[in-house]
């Protein structure tokens, strides 16, 4: 066993050229293998060199082709630019021509329209002028009438009215200052107009010294005078109110009493307020009743 081990360790250098197939190669075979390896390496190197040359030649060709393409594109752009400019010029000329033709057509249409409507417009304008003049005249006359109507009440804003009342067989004269447009002033003017012809009749029927017919006329005139001179009667309340008003005017305490009555403690103001409340309540109840009565 020891000898066998020593032999195995001594042959360790020969293991480098050991082939597992079991056959031994000669030196010629080894040289051929080496040559084949060298040939394979050279072929691979040539292949890589060829690839590099091809790669270098391809961009050059591409550059040449791109240069040609760029030149062709520039030429095409120049040609297209020239053609587009010519087209733009033609379009501009055509647009100007169309605009001028449109303007001419519009002018012709307008002239024909004016010729058709010329006479009618003149007649309409003359009628409008006449209407405007009439309206101006009426408007100028209306303010004058209104001014006259307004000036009349300004001249006689207040009118004094004297009324005669009969209180216990005594004549009581009451004078008031009332607006000219009030109902009292109008009624007073009507009464005075009615009394004027009666006074003329009584003055014309003066009794001469003798005659039966004359007595009759005097009797008739006295009757008319009595009828015309019939006086209104005055109640005690109206007489007391009249006396109170005259007293306030004589003493000059009307404003003081009005200020006092407007205060919180004024009896008249409270009474007026309560009357307004009652009237309002009555109106509300009336509206409710009417709404219920409607179908």
Curated annotation (Swiss-Prot):
Transmembrane segments: none annotated. The modification N6-methyllysine is found at residue 215. GO terms for cellular component: kinetochore; Swr1 complex. PROSITE patterns: BCNT_C. The modification Phosphoserine is found at residues 80, 83-84, 112, 212, 246. It is found in: Chromosome, Centromere, Kinetochore. Residues 214-295 form the BCNT-C domain. This is Craniofacial development protein 1. It comes from Rattus norvegicus.
